[in-house]
């Protein structure tokens, strides 16, 4: 029954927690049998049948591009900065890979069992080992400390107690709470980028904004995954296969554009960039303009007070 409700111009399923290339492949295969069509209806497919390079790591890559733009806006170089990452799946792996490429030092990853602190930096074969940990199916990170001397496994705790310059939730929802936020603030964190979906609790977000911290929500920071799904669909529609460099460059430009929109709508009179406000207003304005351009009449719709937008008539 599902196949009637999905399509390249209708609804496009993709991977997430618990849904990877294998599951997407099974669904795409059945969809083809039912429709007798090869279209970009599913994304995150295998490279052998219409998938895109960079797609598995795209969410992490895009998140780092966004964070770099946040720092650049304040004249801060990401090179040499320490980074705390949670999780050890595709998103965390992509984030660690791109952070290292940009010259930052990743010092933590985490799992349900606790977190790893590696002051020497998680790069090279250590990043590759993250994939081995995930493939093992054990859902633990403790073996990392056994394999790489000098690193420490901290059982049952989250990585936000480590003093770092940049914090990147990459695991799951509500993984960074108000107490964690205050730990980061007290440790003088520069920037928090929410790469996981709803990774920060409302209390944490309020604390970041109250302290005028550079914080950006997942709806902006983790858009790289959805953006690259769109790039995969474009390749399918044109029957092309772009190189990894081509996809990466397009992804970088998309994240740059998203950041610019957040800055446009989120900059406050005192110069603080409220990325939550900016992302919300930018998203709303895009949808509202499209609706009005297509003939939808919006009459005296009052926007919620926190957006300070007034009304559209």
Residue ranges and their predicted role:
Residues 114-215, 220:
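Rossmann-like adenosine-cofactor binding region
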Residues 10-15, 37-42, 85, 108-111, ...:
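General beta-strand structural signal in soluble alpha/beta enzymes
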Residues 185-299:
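Adenosine-phosphate binding glycine-rich loop
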């Amino acid at each position: 029954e599902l196949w009637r409700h999905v399509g390249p111009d209708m609804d496009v399923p993709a991977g997430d927690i618990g849904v990877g290339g294998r599951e997407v492949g099974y669904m795409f295969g059945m969809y083809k049998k039912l429709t007798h069509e090869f279209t970009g209806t599913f994304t995150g497919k295998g490279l052998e049948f219409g998938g895109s390079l960079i797609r598995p790591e795209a969410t992490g890559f895009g998140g780092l591009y966004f964070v770099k733009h946040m720092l650049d806006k304040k004249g801060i170089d990401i090179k040499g900065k320490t980074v705390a990452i949670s999780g050890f799946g595709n998103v965390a792996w992509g984030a660690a890979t791109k952070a290292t490429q940009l010259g930052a030092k990743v010092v933590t990853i985490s799992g349900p069992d606790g977190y790893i602190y590696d002051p020497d930096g998680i790069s090279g074969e250590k990043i590759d080992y993250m994939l081995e940990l995930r493939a093992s199916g054990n859902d633990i990170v403790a073996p990392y400390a056994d394999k790489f001397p000098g690193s420490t496994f901290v059982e049952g705790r989250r990585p936000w107690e480590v003093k770092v310059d940049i914090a990147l939730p990459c695991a799951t929802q509500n993984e960074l709470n108000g107490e964690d936020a205050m730990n980061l603030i007290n440790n003088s964190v520069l920037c928090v980028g929410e790469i996981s979906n709803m990774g920060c609790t409302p209390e944490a977000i309020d604390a970041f904004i109250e302290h005028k911290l550079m914080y950006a929500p997942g709806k902006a920071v983790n858009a790289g995954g959805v953006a690259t799904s769109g790039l995969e669909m474009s390749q399918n529609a044109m029957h092309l296969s772009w190189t990894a460099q081509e996809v990466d460059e397009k992804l970088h430009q998309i994240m740059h554009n998203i950041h610019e929109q957040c800055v446009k709508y989120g900059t406050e009179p005192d110069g603080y960039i409220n990325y939550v406000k900016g992302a919300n207003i930018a998203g709303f304005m895009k949808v509202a303009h499209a609706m009005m351009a297509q003939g939808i009449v919006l009459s005296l719709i009052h926007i919620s007070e926190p957006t300070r937008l007034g009304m559209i008539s």
